[in-house]
Amino acid sequence: MANPQNLHPGPVFLAGPTAVGKSEVALRLAEKLGGEIISVDSMQVYRGLDIGTAKPTAAERAAVPHHLIDVVEISQPFDAAKFVMLARVAEAQIVARGRVPIFCGGTGLYFKAWLDGLGEAPAADATLRAALEAAPLETLLNELRERDPTTFETIDRQNPRRVIRAVEVIRL
């Protein structure tokens, strides 16, 4: 029988909507399990974006190491692929120290990318993107409906960024 003291739990995942207490639970778990927290929040990655992002306090960050907070400038792009890349590095470093990675946040896309991987999508094309951004949303939605009805039915049609990217992927 394995010695329970030698068992090392795998990563812990805490996901949910804003203001349900995820961060508090993550802090308690980190203290109990000897863990470190990996932020799964699309806004906490940005330096200087402190209002409205519920970043952990300096005291909380001193008590328990946090990762993927304040890692890029607000002017730099950051996406799910970059999150996965940085989260892999953070997780490997945490595990190498014999500690437990605790993924905590509310950005569902980042959790999905981490757990399910990212689909094979073409890289963005600046020229095409500019043309699509200039087009009326209704025109893009019509093209999406005709060329990819499945995506049309599932996409947030009120979100121009998602519609533009969907049409961009179709055209590339």
Predicted regions, residues:
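Phosphate/pyrophosphate-binding catalytic cores of soluble transferases and nucleic-acid-acting enzymes
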Residues: M1-L172
